[in-house]
Amino acid sequence: MLPFSRIAIIGLGLIGSSLAHAIRAYLPTARVTGHDADPDVRAIARRIDLCDDITDTAGAAVIDADLVVLCVPPGAMAAVAAAIAPDLAADVILSETASCQVSIIAAIRAVLPDVTLVPAHPVAGTENSGPESGFATLFQNRWCILTPPAGTEPLAVARVEDLWKKVGANVETMDAAHHDLVLAVTSHLPHIIAYTIVGTASDLENVTQGEVIKYSAGGFRDFTRIAASDPTMWRDVFLANKDAVLQMLQRFTEDLTQLQRAIRWDDGDALFEHFSKTRAIRRSIIEQGQDDAAPDFGRHRE
């Protein structure tokens, strides 16, 4: 398998900075060039020696790169793709890490119709953001889902798959539309629920914010961790994947109504059955190594 020799990462938040750390740790022969639209982020990236090179423009970052990875919010993907178009090498492989794929693939294809595109979404993260939040082991034993459009060159897909395996990820290939539906269930819906619960608690008129903070139980604290995620990225995710998110919200609303009815009518059997089923799912997640009781899924920063 021909390894990538020059990798450009556009967007140096949690995912982009972690990918830079991981490539430099596990693929030391590859040269990593990074860019971020925010000059303060670029300054931090230079200070912490995040990449071999940090450029002031996206176009400069991708010159001579054989792999370009877009790690920007979904709403910025099309503009960034257009900005780098004149400087891309003819044989470059373009990838992106968005958690919603159908609309992003279409947006990129609109400005780069002929580029070899291999999207790769790492299902990994923390509530932190920014270039100093990244660490090389973020992707260890996490899934990375590839969603190559139909007709993508198999060798290009294999090379991107190989890169993600080398930085520690488990790799799966999936249809983009199915990916978006799965992630609406496992990621997008939990985030919108967390934002809503924390927002409701902060808006209660007969309970002060001070009391909410002082007496927060473990479950509420878990929701606040999720609700601390990057608001720009999540705004873009919900808008970009709105059809799947709305579908899952409708299903969730129906299920919530059933629970409300069970509580109202003292139907303890229905509640117990539901809670037992969901408890089993939690145990399965831990058994498959997709969670850990320790912070950051038990991973240590490197």
Regions found by a protein language model. Give the residues of each.
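NAD(P)+-binding Rossmann beta1-loop-alpha1 motif at the extreme N-terminus of oxidoreductases
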Residues: 1-54, 62-64
